[in-house]
């Protein structure tokens, strides 16, 4: 504070009065009485120095209003502020070493120095607090994740797709923080593009040369941000298409059990199917019919432009079961696999009845139908395992051919047409030849009706009918 001329006394007295009212006089005033008396005795060297006021006189002086333009002194300023200011931050006119010798100059000069020194310091402090804030604001990292930054870049592009360089260019131009630290965050953008399902890679067109693929947003991930705000995502986006296909495949394999799609792949080539075959035909050749139909449907989805399957064009395949296993199947599942066999036996009986006489044909047909049920222990495996029955079935045609030429053929047919179980009974009961004939025909008929394939059923039936007619014609003559 600067003191001058005539108004300095009122200023000094006003300052002293305000300070004395606020500070406890009993505590502060005891040590200052002696100092004030000493200062008054010494006097001030300056001719225009203001007169000193004692504390008892200061109580009677009313406070003076400050001049216009001067700041009002603070109420918390203690009584010894001029000396403290002189000691703490003395200005150019303050003498710190001798405060008692030159109290007026030291006090006034210290106050001037403190005021002059405090002004620029306060200004520089306030200016220093505001000046560094501007560059800091420009370098603040944006509160957006890398996924949000990539989404912003893709959505603002005209074609809604950008390359990696285009995304980095948009982020650098939009945010100065990333512009100054450009090479450090480019790999982070690349990793987020590759590892998140919400971004889809699009290869370049043939007529669009350049480096790098395009990236766009998955159509189902448009609502992954709340209300269009890029500050927060609702949840992590995942594609459910592949999981849905895997669930369908697993369900299909469980429904078919052992006849799964893996049965077709087990016998296929290294690429999952035999060479030169359609997937549907390959699956139908090695798997269950139900699994083949499922494999055909799956192949139609996987190979939409492949050739049509070959399986419907070809005739049904012949069962590759040997005769012994087929006999076991017939014995175990007679009621389920028997309709075709029963139809063939019925047709064989009808042919035999048409070739013979009326009575013999009726007896033969009735015995042919009743013989399998009357003998439940009969099976094809027993006849084939007996030994002579296997070549006997093949020798029927030779016997019949010889019987048409002469009597030697008749004896051959008589010896081979008798089954092993009825040889002794036929020798002992020579008078009952129709019964032995019927038993012979009933015994041979199942052998001829169960060939290795279904292609020889009709020739076997005609051969059996011819053998029965030849035997009936030859045996009454003997």
Swiss-Prot record:
Composition-biased stretches (Acidic residues): 21-39
One Gene Ontology term of the molecular function aspect: DNA-binding transcription factor activity, RNA polymerase II-specific
Tissue: Expressed in chronic myeloid leukemia, Jurkat T-cell leukemia and teratocarcinoma cell lines, but not in any other cell lines or normal tissues examined.
Xref: PROSITE patterns: FORK_HEAD_1, FORK_HEAD_2, FORK_HEAD_3
SUPFAM superfamilies on file: Winged helix' DNA-binding domain
Pfam family name, one: Forkhead
Region (Disordered): 1-136
UniProt keyword annotations, A-Z: Activator, Developmental protein, DNA-binding, Nucleus, Repressor, Transcription, Transcription regulation
Broad class of where this protein is predominantly found: nucleus
SMART domains assigned to the protein according to its UniProt record, in alphabetical order: FH
Keyword Transcription: yes
Top-rank taxon, per record: Eukaryota
Gly residues compositional bias, start-end: 104-128
GO biological process per UniProt: anatomical structure morphogenesis; cell differentiation; in utero embryonic development; negative regulation of transcription by RNA polymerase II; positive regulation of transcription by RNA polymerase II; regulation of transcription by RNA polymerase II
Localisation per UniProt entry: Nucleus
InterPro entries: FH_FOXD3 (IPR047392), Fork_head_dom (IPR001766), FOX_domain-containing (IPR050211), TF_fork_head_CS_1 (IPR018122), TF_fork_head_CS_2 (IPR030456), WH-like_DNA-bd_sf (IPR036388), WH_DNA-bd_sf (IPR036390)
PANTHER family, per database record: FORKHEAD BOX PROTEIN, FORKHEAD BOX PROTEIN D3
Subunit structure: Interacts with POU5F1.
Illness the protein is tied to: Autoimmune disease 1: An autoimmune disorder characterized by the association of vitiligo with autoimmune thyroiditis (Hashimoto thyroiditis).
Role according to the record: Binds to the consensus sequence 5'-A[AT]T[AG]TTTGTTT-3' and acts as a transcriptional repressor. Also acts as a transcriptional activator. Negatively regulates transcription of transcriptional repressor RHIT/ZNF205. Promotes development of neural crest cells from neural tube progenitors. Restricts neural progenitor cells to the neural crest lineage while suppressing interneuron differentiation. Required for maintenance of pluripotent cells in the pre-implantation and peri-implantation stages of embryogenesis.
Protein name per the record: Forkhead box protein D3
Taxonomic path: Eukaryota, Metazoa, Chordata, Craniata, Vertebrata
């Amino acid at each position: 504070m600067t003191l001058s001329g005539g108004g300095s006394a009122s200023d000094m007295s006003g300052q002293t009065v305000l300070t004395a009212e606020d500070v406890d006089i009993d505590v502060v005033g005891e040590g200052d009485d002696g100092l004030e008396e000493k200062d008054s005795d010494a006097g001030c060297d300056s001719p225009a120095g203001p007169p000193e006021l004692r504390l008892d006189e200061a109580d009677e002086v009313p406070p003076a209003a400050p001049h216009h333009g001067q700041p009002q002194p603070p109420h918390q300023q203690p009584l010894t502020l001029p000396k403290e200011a002189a000691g703490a931050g003395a200005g150019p006119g303050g003498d710190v070493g001798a405060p008692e010798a030159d109290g007026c100059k030291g006090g006034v000069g210290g106050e001037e120095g403190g005021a002059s020194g405090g002004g620029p310091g306060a200004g520089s402090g306030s200016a220093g607090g505001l000046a560094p804030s501007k560059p800091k604001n420009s370098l603040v990292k944006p509160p957006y994740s890398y996924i949000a930054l990539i989404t912003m870049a893709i959505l603002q592009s005209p074609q809604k797709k950008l390359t990696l360089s285009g995304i980095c260019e948009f982020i650098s131009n939009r945010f100065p923080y990333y512009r100054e630290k450009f090479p450090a965050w480019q790999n982070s953008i690349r990793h987020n593009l590759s590892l998140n399902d919400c971004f889809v890679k699009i290869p370049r067109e043939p007529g669009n040369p350049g480096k790098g693929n395009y990236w766009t947003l998955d159509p189902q991930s448009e609502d992954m941000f709340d209300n269009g705000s890029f500050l927060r995502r609702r949840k992590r986006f995942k594609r459910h298409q592949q999981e849905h296909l895997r669930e369908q495949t697993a369900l299909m394999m469980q429904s078919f059990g052992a006849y799964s799609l893996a049965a077709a792949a087990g016998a296929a080539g290294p690429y999952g199917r035999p060479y030169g075959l359609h997937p549907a035909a390959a699956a139908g050749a090695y798997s269950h019919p139900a699994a083949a139909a499922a494999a055909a449907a799956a192949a139609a989805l996987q190979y939409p432009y492949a050739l049509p399957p070959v399986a419907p064009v070809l005739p049904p395949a012949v069962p590759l079961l040997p005769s012994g296993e087929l006999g076991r199947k017939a014995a175990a599942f007679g009621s389920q696999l028997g309709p075709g066999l029963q139809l063939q036996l019925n047709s064989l009986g009808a042919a035999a009845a048409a070739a013979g006489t009326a009575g013999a044909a009726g007896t033969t047909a009735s015995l042919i139908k009743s013989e399998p049920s009357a003998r439940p222990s009969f099976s094809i495996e027993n006849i084939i395992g007996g030994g002579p029955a296997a070549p006997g079935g093949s020798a029927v045609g030779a016997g019949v051919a010889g019987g048409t030429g002469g009597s030697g053929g008749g004896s051959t047919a008589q010896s081979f047409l008798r089954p092993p179980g009825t040889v002794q009974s036929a020798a002992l009961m020579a008078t009952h030849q129709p019964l032995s004939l019927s038993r012979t025909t009933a015994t041979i008929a199942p052998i001829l009706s169960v060939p290795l394939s279904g292609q020889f059923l009709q020739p076997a039936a005609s051969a059996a009918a011819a053998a029965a007619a030849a035997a009936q014609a030859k045996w009454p003559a003997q």
